[in-house]
Every structure is written in structure tokens, then in C-alpha cells.
Amino acid sequence: MHYFALLLHPERTTPPSPDQQAVEMAEWERFHELAAPAIRAGDALAPAADAVRITGGPDAPVVTEGPYAEGAEVAGGYYVFEAADLDAALAIAQDIPAARFGAVEVWPMVEWRRPVRALAGDWLALLLEPVESASAPGSAEWIEGARAHEAFGRAADEHILTGAALQHHSTATTVQVRDGKTALTDGPFAEGAEVAHGFYVLAATDRDEAVKLASMIPASTVEVRRLAGISGL
């Protein structure tokens, strides 16, 4: 099975020192070496200050600057894992460095589209829906939405590098590690008005084109973030 891991942590206000950056990179390299057999995709995200939020749907998109989360933690990266079951995916997630100073949301995925090439400097479109209207895969509402995504896929096929729907938010698990102890919590990390519902990674020449493409996605809200292009995946 495939699982989507969304990495959440406090946004930095100042860059790390060269020594601290070297230490952190070594931690991420160790994780990649450890989890390499399970990692299928992933990357860090560019600063949240550069995020774009799109609301209103394809018929009347409204574009605003900044990330969707108004809390202390922002999305800092993502992974796609292949694991035998949820327990195996959570065991991988607890080794992600972000779990020690932030949190990792782990979501079962639906119908993952494998990347058509290595991802670097492309654009993550994170799809969000109001909690009360988020539908479960297989429901009539979900099937209707899937048809709309199929239409988007036909219109933007050459720009879609990968993507997937996520299972209902009730199936998500939040992973945090503090003082060597792992805490698992049912549900997403932030109890907000919106929850993740799916994602795409889009190829675009610049942010304007990425926003134009993301505005076509049939979702209540889309957060557009550039990939940092440092994972080599």
C-alpha cells in the first residue's frame, strides 16, 4: 500500500548556521538511507511565505498569498511510502527528523499516479476540503468528484507529474517523537476547518503558470508550494 506523509514544523524566521545546516542534512541523509526501500517520492518545500492559496473552485478562483495554516506549524515537505500496512508506514514516519521537532501526518492513499520523472523545482498542489464535506472514497460524492478530477487530468495531463487522492481524514495518523518516545494520535495534526483530501505535483515554468494550473483543480482550496528540489527523488 502507498501512504502520504505530510511533514509539519514551525516555520523558521532565520536561516540555520552552516554547522547546524550540516548536522540537519546528515540527519536527513541517514533517514533516506534507512528508508530508501520504502520511499517512492518526496521533497522539502520552499518557504511557506511563498505559498499561494486558491479558493472558490475552478469556476471562480480567488488567489491569495500565504499558506493555509494559521497555526505555528506549516507544511515543510512530503513523502510517499510503500509499506505493507499502516503500522509499517508509521514505523517509517517516526524516523523522519521532522517528527522530533514538529509532526508527521500519515494518510493512506488512493490511486497513486507514479512520477513520470524525477521531481525537482516542481510544484506541490495540496488539496483541502472543509471537514464537514470531506467525502470517503467510494461514496457517491467522492465518485462525482473523481469524475471532475478525471476531466482535470485530461486538460492538464502533460503538466501532472504525480498525484493521488487521500483516504478520509478519519484514517490519518499524526506521529510525534519527543525525548525518544513516539506518540501516535488519530486524525490530522491540526484540528482546523479544512483537511487534506489529495495532492498533485505539477510541472510549470513559473509560479504564475503553476497557479493557473492549480486553479483548474476541482477542490474547495488548493495550496500551491514549490518543491525545494533537494531530495533527488
Regions found by a protein language model. Give the residues of each.
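Conserved, structured core segments of small domains
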Residues: 1-233
